[in-house]
Regions:
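Positively charged, Gly/Ser-enriched RNA/tRNA-binding surfaces
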Residues: 25-42, 54, 86-97, 105-154, ...
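TRNA-binding/sensing appendages of the translation machinery
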Residues: 1-84, 140
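A structural signal for short, well-ordered beta-strand segments and their strand-loop junctions
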Residues: 46-49, 104-106, 158-162, 263-265
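Beta-rich nucleic-acid/ligand-interaction surfaces
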Residues: 49-67, 162-172, 268-277, 368-374
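Cap/lid and interdomain-hinge subdomains that line or gate substrate/regulatory clefts
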Residues: 134, 138-139, 153, 160-161, ...
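Short, basic, helix/turn surface patches
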Residues: 72-83, 186-187, 382-390
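Internal, well-ordered alpha-helical segments in soluble enzyme and binding-protein domains
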Residues: 142, 163-166, 180, 184, ...
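Acidic, His- and aromatic-enriched active-site or binding-groove loops in soluble protein domains
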Residues: 69-75, 176-197, 284
């Protein structure tokens, strides 16, 4: 009993120290740290990659990229290189594979053109990628990690889950052109069933298939609430198999405290040439757009690495500092003011005695403008004298 009490007290102490440590970081940096710890806890290994790839690699897979432009330059040997606009492509191409699953996480930057300024900018991302045999359990694990990642950002979050076997597979049966498919997909993503019906009618899609598309586009709610509706609408083998997969996910996550944050929403769609199976997007209260995106991409993985399946997601960290500004009460625990170095040889050892105990310390000649410390000392004649708390 005494041993348990000691361990419990030590655990609480460590937790308090960690909270104080994270409080000194920006939202972006603290998330990097916490998410890395989460992924390691689940057995994922950190993957580090080169900043550059040959331009032709990204150019050949341009359809997969969400970025409008690729930032390129000539290498010293004359090769055309690119600052990476995407991380998934690089991991699939370069990761070492084995008979076991390759479970990786990363903290990297990509370089993409801004939609607003049309200038290139650095975007920081973290995320996970799994290469190997993807089964229903692994899909549930990755979705659980995605939900936990969102909770780390904000307890008020939603993870919207969809499946490529429904609307994309139905569109493939209709015998319509690619431009019409794109128009219908835009309507589905915007939940615009009025225009969807008009496009289908103009394109000669029968009323039965049109209504099925409209009903599928309207599927949105918690898994247990809408999965029976979706199962009733399944009209081919691919849809029925997808319903079984979604039922497994629902059963696996039902006891999770995050289960009520997962929504089934078929308006979430992605590139049909690369993605298959489960796809998902994550939202938090203060951010105006998705901060997490992922899915299963066997088509892309198989294109780059034969007989390889894959699933993963990325968390976009670049704008979170804007939406989640931390209000730090103090800039440091201790501020020490001293006049000159002469006769103050013991000052450095004194500062180290504080930092060794976990305190944050700043040493200055004068009070920095706008700086706040829990305790302010003046260092005089080899000793500290408390001045004031500011």
């Amino acid at each position: 009993m005494i041993k348990y009490a000691i361990l419990s007290a030590y655990s609480d102490y460590q937790e308090n120290i960690m909270e104080e440590f994270l409080a000194t970081m920006s939202k972006e940096d603290s998330l990097n740290y916490e998410l890395s710890r989460l992924y390691k806890q689940w057995g994922y290994k950190e993957y580090r990659m080169a900043k550059f790839e040959e331009y032709s690699f990204y150019s050949d897979n341009r359809d997969f990229l969400t970025a409008k432009g690729i930032l390129a330059f000539n290498n010293s040997d004359g090769r055309l290189m690119a600052l990476k606009p995407d991380i998934t492509l690089s991991i699939v191409k370069n990761a070492k594979l084995s008979s076991a699953l390759t479970k990786l996480y990363y903290n990297e930057s990509v370089f993409r053109m801004s939609d607003s300024s049309m200038d290139y900018k650095e975007i920081k991302q973290t995320g996970v990628e799994v290469l190997g045999k993807v089964d229903d359990y692994l899909v549930a694990e990755v979705l659980s990690l995605a939900a936990k990642s969102l909770k780390t950002i904000d307890k008020d979050f939603v993870l919207s889950v969809s499946h490529m076997a429904f609307i994309p597979s139905l569109l493939a049966e209709l015998g319509i052109g690619e431009n019409v498919k794109k128009d219908i997909i835009r309507c589905v993503q915007g939940k615009n069933t009025h225009d969807l019906r008009a496009i289908c009618e103009k394109s000669g899609v029968c009323s039965e298939k049109t209504e099925l598309l409209a009903k599928l586009a309207g599927i949105n709610g918690r898994f247990d609430e809408v999965l029976p509706q979706l199962t009733a609408l399944a009209c081919n083998g691919a849809m029925k198999k997808a319903c079984d997969e979604l039922a497994f996910i629902a059963a696996s996550l039902r006891k999770s405290p995050l289960a009520d944050r997962l929504y089934l929403d078929l308006s979430v769609l992605n590139n049909t040439e690369y993605y298959n199976g489960i796809i998902f997007q994550g939202y938090v209260e203060k951010a105006p757009s998705a901060v997490l995106s992922g899915g299963r991409y066997d088509k892309l993985a198989g294109k780059l690495r034969e007989n390889t399946q894959a699933i993963g997601f990325a968390v976009y960290l670049d704008n979170l500092n804007l939406y989640y500004k931390k209000k730090r009460e103090f800039d440091s625990d201790i501020l020490i003011l001293f006049g000159s170095s002469e006769g103050n040889e013991s000052l450095l050892a004194l500062v180290e005695s504080f930092t060794d105990k976990g305190f944050s310390v700043r040493v200055e000649h004068t009070m920095p403008e706008g700086y706040k410390a829990k305790t302010v000392y003046a260092f005089e004649n080899g000793a500290l004298r408390e001045v004031t708390a500011c």
